[in-house]
Amino acid sequence: MALKARALYSFQGENKEEINILENEELHLFSDVSLDGWLQGTNSRGQTGLFPASYVEILRPRSGSVQVDYSGHTQGYTDSPHQGSYDDDEEDDDDWDDWDDGQTVVDEPSGSNGVSRSQLQHHHHYPRPEYTHRPRPALERQDSIASGKRGSVVGRNLNRFSSFVRSGVEAFVLGDVPQFGGVSESHAIEMGPKGPQWKANPRPFSCSVEEPTKQTKFKGIKSYISYRLTPDPCNSPVYRRYKHFDWLYNRLLHKFTVISVPHLPEKQATGRFEEDFIQKRKRRLVLWMDHMTSHPVLSQYDGFQHFLSCQDEKQWKAGKRRAERDELVGASFLLTLQLPTEHQDLQDVEERVDVFKAFSKKMDENVLQLSSVVSELARKHLGGFRKEFQRLGAALQGLSHSFQLDPPYSSEPLVGAISHTGRTYEAVGEMFAEQPKNDQFRFLDTLSLYQGLLSNFPDIIHLQKGAFAKVKESQRMSDEGRMEQDEADGIRKRCRVVGFALQAEINHFHQRRLQDFKQAIQHYLKEQILFYRRVSQELEKTLHMYDDL
């Protein structure tokens, strides 16, 4: 039975985690337990997010207490890293082919801010309501009071749903993340010519994604597409479904809080077995795999290596559980980082982060604009250009037919040449319609990948900004005699870890950006040259038909 509430007052959300509610509006709650004075639920417009608990009245059944089942709402606030979740071929089944022998041990992440972007970013157009001003609720402070631990003297962030808090990075900076004895996993950051960078993978490799094949099970009741993955240099192929990629992607999000994990290509509810969609997803999985194998940290992740190599059912299940029970995830992953000895002034790091923040915002805007322009051009190739050239060809052939109506004055060679010209332009129209798959679609694949990568950085940068704020607060408290200098130095040291990790990720992003956009635009230009050369050759052949008239 769904848990419902009624809004006592109107509330206007002030950030992407909060939603608007109207007085007397009926709301659906995920739980009646408030977190620091906030509830999470869905309004009547389908928007999911947070609103003040004091602004609503929970509607409880009159007849006794009823056990409320929240399982139906789990998807409402579990992160969906790519839009659409109705892909029938992605449903969980029981057998080894699905690699799913039970529920996932570790809860899936909800993105860095705890609420699914796809749930928060609805594009409904409703008239803006009039809101009655009411002070925002006072948040409960029990978790902000200094505990007996020395590392928790600095006040905690009151917004318990910010990415800085939910990721655990706040707890790490304050020294509240427990140390693990005998940590075997480690990732080194070294100083390069342009600042901190991830140490290269000592065993670099690549992996091809090939042969998307439709397969069936349960005597044809279930259908799905599998892909052949062949890591190089081992050259031992494995076959994976999209849902297996999805499982891996969620493990990556759960573990690597400070790394921009490339987004998977989107799911699709209908038409997923159509050839165009299959090829599009394959192209984008190729790019995704290329970014994964080229990343010095992601490529060495045990879960990724297991995904690429395991072929045995029992071994897979053991490795799957191992990945899901990994304790070095989120903020604990920061414990695995080995930093260089070089000193970096935190103010310089903050300025560097601000520069990248402005850069990534501008690049994101321009990638979106370029993607829109290229998409429109591709649509014209498929529709408008093709249609116009076919109209031109038909008109020329109509002219040639009219020349035959007065036989004594008709010129067969000229009629034939004009008719051939018409057919040539019709063929050119078909060439325009076929061209996007050679250049524009591939360019759009790269732009889509970078839209995903860039969309990760605001939350990652927010982690660093939160760490900077804790350093400044701790230093102020130390100067006022309210904190030992050793404690403030510890916070500064842990902030340095976050700063080095972010700079290393920025460095890797720029390296890949330079390489990817060089290759993408080179490929686009080469294909455009070949295309117009073929068009030119067809027109030249037609032109020569007029030479001897």
UniProtKB/Swiss-Prot annotation:
GO molecular function: phosphatidylinositol binding
First-listed, main subcellular location of the protein, grouped into a coarse class: cytoplasm
Compartment(s): Cytoplasm, Cytosol; Membrane; Cytoplasmic vesicle membrane
Entries under PROSITE patterns matching the protein: PX, SH3
Entries under Gene3D superfamilies matching the protein: Arfaptin homology (AH) domain/BAR domain, Phox-like domain, SH3 Domains
Domain SH3, first and last residues per copy: 1-61
Domain BAR: 346-549
Cell division recorded as keyword: yes
GO cellular component, one term: cytosol
Annotated region described as Disordered, given as residue ranges: 66-137
Top-level taxon: Eukaryota
Domain PX: 205-315
Biased composition (Basic and acidic residues): 127-137
Membrane topology designation: Peripheral membrane protein
Gene Ontology biological process: cleavage furrow formation; endocytosis; endosomal transport; endosome organization; macropinocytosis; mitotic cytokinesis; plasma membrane tubulation; protein transport
Range of residues in the leader sequence: none
SUPFAM superfamilies, per the entry: PX domain, SH3-domain
InterPro entries found in the cross-reference section: AH/BAR_dom_sf, PX_dom, PX_dom_sf, SH3-like_dom_sf, SH3_domain, Snx9_fam, Sorting_nexin_WASP-bd-dom
Keywords tagged on the record: Cell cycle, Cell division, Cytoplasm, Cytoplasmic vesicle, Endocytosis, Membrane, Mitosis, Protein transport, SH3 domain, Transport
Skewed-composition ranges (Polar residues): 66-83, 110-119
Domain notes: The PX and BAR domains mediate association with membranes and are required for membrane tubulation.
Function: Plays a role in the reorganization of the cytoskeleton, endocytosis and cellular vesicle trafficking, both during interphase and at the end of mitotic cell divisions. Required for efficient progress through mitosis and cytokinesis. Required for normal formation of the cleavage furrow at the end of mitosis. Modulates endocytosis of cell-surface proteins. Promotes membrane tubulation (in vitro). May promote the formation of macropinosomes.
Entry similarity comment: Belongs to the sorting nexin family.
Protein name: Sorting nexin-33
Native organism: Xenopus tropicalis (Western clawed frog)
